[in-house]
């Protein structure tokens, strides 16, 4: 009986040719696993294609709701970003995929897990560290670090040789990753920084100059930091993301052209579409500015950056990530209320906040006198606050 390998399968170029390559070079029984995080593929087609390509079995795991509730809601609550720009759409999906791969490897008693990540990318780290954190006995096969195929053009040639159909041509050769949260585009002419990216690549977003000519007003209600209602309507978590992707997309919201520092050392360029995430982060940030005290708000910004770096670097299965989640959950206890946004041709303008947990007090913040604050109090405060500066000036160093 042949030993088994569980393959992270998408039906795309890389994983399509890996099936015959594994059989040819390792003589393994290939169990394909497609983790459905909302990439929008025809799963019946994916199943058929995996079997036609030589897999003995195909699992399709629909984890969209788990992805939103257990991963994306953590992103929203923490407002995690990598290098202040990247909303981590790929990064948040990978630990969930690794979790499912290990579960099926255990179920199938497979000794190997295989992925189609390149040897220059971050995903190889995310998958492999995620697998090792759950079961260090499982062996990893990473074809892009082993085989003679050196480019995506080579991969297309190999696909033709072994008779595997792939939805990519040499002329239009972007690497695309798609899920509920985002679409990323890399490779091809994007690798030359002198090239403006082409707007016809967009899947989710209308180019801002072609977006609606009238502004859209949007209300998002959060409960303890998590979105619950859109325009007053309670929706399930997946529908919330879908609806906001539609609203944001038709208003030209959510495009980012980013140069990022990869974990493996080099810089890379990616075009990201994240309409729902962009709207949710903007609304959540506004609500936090009203409901969090000064020091919690400022410290959380530091923690958010650390959280984004952890997730980007594939360190989901760590005690630090769990500890940050616990801190973030504490900060979200009063992050409940409604934020109204005005959307117009790629721009977001926060309009209003309605929350019973506001730390903003109009009576205190106005220029008039109040029982809690007297203008005369400012003089003593300024003297004490400025004392270090005054002492230094007197010393005349």
Swiss-Prot record:
GO cellular component: cytoplasm
GO terms, molecular function: argininosuccinate synthase activity; ATP binding
Main location, first listed in the record: cytoplasm
Binding site for L-aspartate: 118, 122-123
Reactions mediated catalytically: L-citrulline + L-aspartate + ATP = 2-(N(omega)-L-arginino)succinate + AMP + diphosphate + H(+)
Domain of life according to the entry: Bacteria
Metabolic or biological pathway: Amino-acid biosynthesis; L-arginine biosynthesis; L-arginine from L-ornithine and carbamoyl phosphate: step 2/3
Chain positions recorded as ATP binding sites: 8-16, 116
Any one GO biological process: urea cycle
Assembly and interaction partners: Homotetramer.
Record-linked NCBIfam families: argG, PRK00509.1
The protein's name: Argininosuccinate synthase
Gene that specifies this protein: argG
